[in-house]
Design a protein with these regions (language model features):
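Hydrophobic/proline-rich hinge and linker segments of small-molecule sensing/allosteric domains
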Residues: 46-50, 121-142, 226-230
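Flexible hinge/capping segments at coil-to-helix
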Residues: 37, 134-152
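A structural signal for short loop-to-beta-strand junctions that line the ligand-binding cleft
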Residues: 35, 67-68, 116-125, 212-216, ...
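Ligand-binding clefts/hinges and TM-proximal coupling segments of bilobed small-molecule sensing domains
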Residues: 25-29, 159-176, 213-215, 243-280
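C-terminal motif of bacterial Sec signal peptides marking the signal peptidase cleavage site
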Residues: 18-22
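A ligand-binding cleft/hinge motif common to bilobed small-molecule-binding domains
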Residues: 95, 109-117, 165-166, 187-221
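Extracytoplasmic small-molecule ligand-binding "clamshell" domains
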Residues: 27-108
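Periplasmic-binding protein-like
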Residues: 127-134, 202-243, 262-280
Length: 280
């Protein structure tokens, strides 16, 4: 009888371990579609930004455009399925994967150890760091002597929010849910500066006269990569092979020249683009 009870406890423990492995940090079951299920359905759902020009945005004709969108279209084409683009915000990228609302996230998703506990990242396709933009009238070039009365704009759920909270806890953060709202706040003078991916603040300054990126690189050098639900091994493996194959045709340089060159010019191309998942 004791042996039977012991065996039952071991079996129960194993089942609980498997159940936990299929759950995110919130304890909710992670839902995803395998590669075959996506192909059988005829449609892939990819999460992108809709307000973050030039990476993911909706143009004047109501069409999605941008660096991430260009990549998403190629993924769908090579999968042999239709593409359904799903508008996402920084704070809900992980949630959209875990609940099965999207199959893949391509929304300027910076790879971090914390995020890798909740989603699986594929090979990278872009380099990135944090940057800080501020008005020309008072350019912020360092955070070490921050004025206690000033506030810093960040977007909730971004690496900028995490980095500043951990490394500069005394800086007051003015948080927004969307890129568009953060951009409007900066233009309206709601805060002294705005911290975000350097690619994004550089683009903002180039498109908005009167602003300067005083801190072009803050914190560590990171990468941006596609993300899938934790445990979705078949889809992850396919994306990695796809990125390697695309590298042989310099796909991401073509993507840059089609979507980013008007904003950044050619000077940033080789430093930002990652081909074949291989960082320099």
């Amino acid at each position: 009888m004791k042996n039977l009870k012991k065996a039952a406890l071991i079996a129960l423990s194993a089942l609980m371990t498997l159940a936990l492995a299929a759950c995110g940090k919130s304890g909710n079951k992670v839902v995803y579609r395998t590669l075959d299920e996506i192909r059988d359905s005829g449609t892939v759902n990819i999460g992108v930004f809709s307000d973050k020009n030039p990476f993911g945005y909706v143009d004047e004709n109501g069409e999605y455009q941008g660096y991430d969108v260009y990549f998403a279209r190629r993924l769908a084409e090579d999968l042999g399925v239709k593409l359904n683009l799903v508008s996402t915000e920084a704070a809900n990228r992980i949630e959209y994967l875990q609940t099965g609302k999207v199959d893949i996230i391509l929304a300027n998703f910076t790879v971090t150890p914390q995020r890798a506990e909740e989603v699986d990242f594929a090979l990278p396709y872009m380099n990135v760091a944090l940057g800080v933009v501020s008005p020309d009238s008072r350019v912020i070039e360092s955070l070490d002597n921050w004025n206690a009365d000033d506030q810093m704009i960040v977007i909730s759920g971004t690496t900028a929010e995490t980095y500043l909270t951990e490394n500069y806890p005394d800086i007051k953060l003015q948080k927004y849910d969307t890129y568009a709202n953060a951009k409007n706040a900066m233009e309206n003078g709601s805060a002294a500066a705005w911290a975000n991916d350097n690619t994004e603040v550089i683009a903002f300054a180039l498109q908005s006269p009167g602003f300067t990126v005083g801190i072009p690189s803050l914190g560590s050098q990171d990468t941006i990569a596609p993300a899938v639900s934790k445990g979705n091994e078949t889809l992850l493996s396919w994306i990695n092979e796809e990125i390697r194959a695309l590298g042989k045709e310099n796909f991401f340089h073509a993507d840059y020249e089609a979507t980013l060159v008007d904003t950044y010019g050619l000077d940033f191309e080789d430093s930002l683009v990652v081909e074949g998942g291989q960082t320099k």
